[in-house]
């Protein structure tokens, strides 16, 4: 339990004792005491509405109850400096800030671990994100999925979960056959044979042309294979080429995976047949119009879904069911999928399919990622000036840098539409959120370097009582919120809460910096302030690391 949680828990316990001492209610009758942070700092550090909740039990008006609680409160034990009754009976608590100084020592002690939960909570989460088809380049939608997914994985890990990061490689569907036939056409074209036409819905990108040329140069003997063998070969080679490029782009985007799960493996291991037989044995499938259907309406879906079409081919849904059942079999407590906006209709059917196996549907969480518009000079940018095609992740990285791209793409809740201002992302000004945050870190490093030249280094032995400036106290309170913010971001699957926190912390630091000089002739006070800003540095660095963004020491 972090310091903030300890303080809140102590306050709740002391309020509970006060209620009993005031004879307002028996211990067994006292409802849960809720502690909130007031929106306005003027209303204290914490507030509770317990006096209003107790009116029926205590049979008194809420302000009388509030006064009785205040009169019997052990303020010393509760770390409270001042108490105020407001409105109809809210109780506002102004804490004794002495407890905050422990945060400095904790940050310096834990360093890179500061903010993270010390112990695992025993929960296994499989987080699937990106999972783009290996048929072309990654684009802005994939970039948002990658940034949000990787950041969420970092946050969940810091919050004590065991997280497996997984990319589902769609290497077995019709789109891969189309990829193979597209490569085949370009392969023979490179050999001077134009008789092979591009398939309907084929891939016309420059990357396919390059793959065809490369194979024609290195493996001209492929032309002598039978058509079936040639298409089988082009399927594998095409996926290998595309996946190598995707892996490189994602790695350069500071996005990493524990597993690259092949759809083909589901067929090879017989898992699709296994789940189909299992669902049939349980009575959840039926035949109609020559097709095999799953009774997903039994589990709140709006209609039943086809598993096998009347031509004998599987729908995409069947291997997806097998894949998610495989995830459960691997011992995962919770499955989290980050899907594009076009997958919204997939949620109910996928949850319903798991329920056919007796798996509770709430074990599968699906986060729909909304669209991103790339903006430049106030105008939407849809096509690359260089290639004439949709702008790729690689081009975005080259244009604004990895740090800015990742930070901007995690600044908003994933379920909201977002305009990515590329000009702003490149600015070296306070208007650029990532520059603003990184500059705060670099500024702290500069001050620490100057202090070291004077022989002053961050120390837990500094006299923290010398930290009295209101801006310094506000800054320290913000540092103390870090672990709680991580826990909140993890529980709500909300990576943007970390970028919001980073902005707040950087803002508090800049206000403090403008209000109080750190390096002065008062050596003891300087030591205390150096320890404070080192705690801020550690917090900023760790928070930026969660988002996959660097914390530069100079700028």
Swiss-Prot record:
Sequence motif 'HIGH' region, residues: 132-142
Pfam families given in the database record: Arg_tRNA_synt_N, DALR_1, tRNA-synt_1d
Subcellular location: Cytoplasm
EC number: 6.1.1.19
MF (Gene Ontology): arginine-tRNA ligase activity; ATP binding
GO CC term (a single one): cytoplasm
Reactions mediated catalytically: tRNA(Arg) + L-arginine + ATP = L-arginyl-tRNA(Arg) + AMP + diphosphate
InterPro entries: aa-tRNA-synth_I_CS, Arg-tRNA-ligase, Arg-tRNA-synth_N, Arg-tRNA-synth_N_sf, ArgRS_core, DALR_anticod-bd, Rossmann-like_a/b/a_fold, tRNAsynth_Ia_anticodon-bd
Keyword Nucleotide-binding attached: yes
SUPFAM superfamilies: Anticodon-binding domain of a subclass of class I aminoacyl-tRNA synthetases, Arginyl-tRNA synthetase (ArgRS), N-terminal 'additional' domain, Nucleotidylyl transferase
Annotated transmembrane regions: none
GO biological process terms held by the UniProt record: arginyl-tRNA aminoacylation
Keyword annotations of the record: Aminoacyl-tRNA synthetase, ATP-binding, Cytoplasm, Ligase, Nucleotide-binding, Protein biosynthesis
Enzyme class: ligase
Subunit (UniProt): Monomer.
Family: Belongs to the class-I aminoacyl-tRNA synthetase family.
UniProt-recorded name of the protein: Arginine--tRNA ligase
Upper taxonomic lineage: Bacteria, Bacillati, Bacillota, Bacilli, Bacillales
Designated gene of the protein: argS
């Amino acid at each position: 339990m972090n310091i903030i949680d300890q303080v809140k828990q102590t306050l709740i316990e002391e309020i509970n004792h006060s209620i009993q001492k005031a004879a307002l209610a028996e211990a067994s009758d006292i409802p849960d005491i809720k502690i909130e942070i007031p929106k306005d700092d003027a209303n204290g550090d914490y507030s509770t509405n317990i006096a209003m909740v107790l009116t029926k039990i205590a049979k008194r008006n809420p302000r009388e109850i509030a006064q009785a609680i205040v009169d019997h409160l052990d303020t010393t034990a509760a770390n409270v400096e001042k108490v105020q009754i407001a409105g109809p009976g809210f109780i506002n608590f102004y804490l004794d800030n002495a407890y905050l100084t422990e945060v400095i020592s904790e940050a310096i002690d834990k360093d890179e671990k500061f903010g993270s939960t010390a112990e695992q909570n025993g929960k296994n989460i499989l987080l699937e994100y990106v999972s783009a088809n290996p048929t072309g380049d990654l684009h802005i939608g994939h970039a948002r999925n990658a940034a949000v997914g990787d950041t969420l994985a970092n946050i969940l890990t810091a919050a004590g979960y065991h997280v497996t990061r997984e990319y589902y490689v769609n290497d077995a569907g019709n789109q891969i056959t189309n990829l193979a036939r597209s490569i085949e056409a370009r392969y023979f074209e490179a050999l001077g044979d134009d008789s092979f036409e591009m398939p309907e819905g084929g891939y016309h990108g420059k990357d396919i042309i390059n793959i065809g040329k490369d194979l024609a140069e290195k493996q001209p003997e492929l032309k002598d294979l039978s058509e079936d063998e040639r298409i089988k070969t082009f399927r594998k080679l095409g996926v290998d080429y595309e996946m190598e490029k995707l892996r490189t782009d994602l790695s350069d985007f500071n996005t990493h995976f524990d597993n690259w799960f092949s759809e083909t493996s589901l067929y090879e291991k017989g898992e699709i047949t296994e789940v189909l037989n299992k669902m049939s044995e349980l009575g959840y499938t039926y035949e109609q119009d020559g097709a095999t259907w799953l009774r997903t309406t039994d589990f709140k879906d709006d209609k039943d879904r086809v598993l096998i079409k009347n031509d004998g081919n599987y729908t995409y849904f069947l291997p997806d069911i097998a894949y998610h059942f495989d995830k459960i079999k691997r011992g995962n407590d919770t499955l989290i999928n980050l899907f594009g906006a076009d997958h919204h209709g997939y949620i109910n059917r996928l949850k319903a399919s798991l329920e056919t196996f007796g798996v509770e549907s709430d074990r599968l969480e699906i986060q729909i990622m909304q669209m991103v518009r790339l903006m430049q000079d106030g105008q939407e940018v849809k096509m690359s000036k260089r290639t004439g095609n949709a702008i790729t992740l690689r081009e975005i990285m080259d244009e604004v840098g990895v740090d800015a791209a990742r930070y901007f793409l995690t600044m908003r809740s994933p379920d909201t539409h977002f305009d990515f201002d590329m000009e702003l992302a490149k600015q070296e000004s306070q208007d650029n959120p990532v520059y603003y945050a990184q500059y705060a870190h670099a500024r702290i490093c500069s001050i620490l370097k100057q202090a070291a030249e004077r022989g002053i280094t961050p120390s837990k032995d500094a006299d923290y009582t010398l930290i009295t400036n209101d801006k310094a106290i506000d800054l320290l309170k913000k540092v103390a919120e870090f672990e709680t913010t991580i826990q909140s971001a993890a529980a709500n699957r909300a990576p943007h809460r970390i970028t919001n926190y980073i902005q707040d912390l950087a803002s508090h630091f800049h206000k403090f910096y403008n209000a109080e000089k750190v390096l002065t002739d008062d050596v003891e006070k300087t030591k205390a302030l150096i320890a404070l800003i080192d705690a801020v540095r550690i917090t900023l660095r760790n928070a930026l690391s969660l988002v996959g963004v660097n914390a530069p020491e100079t700028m």
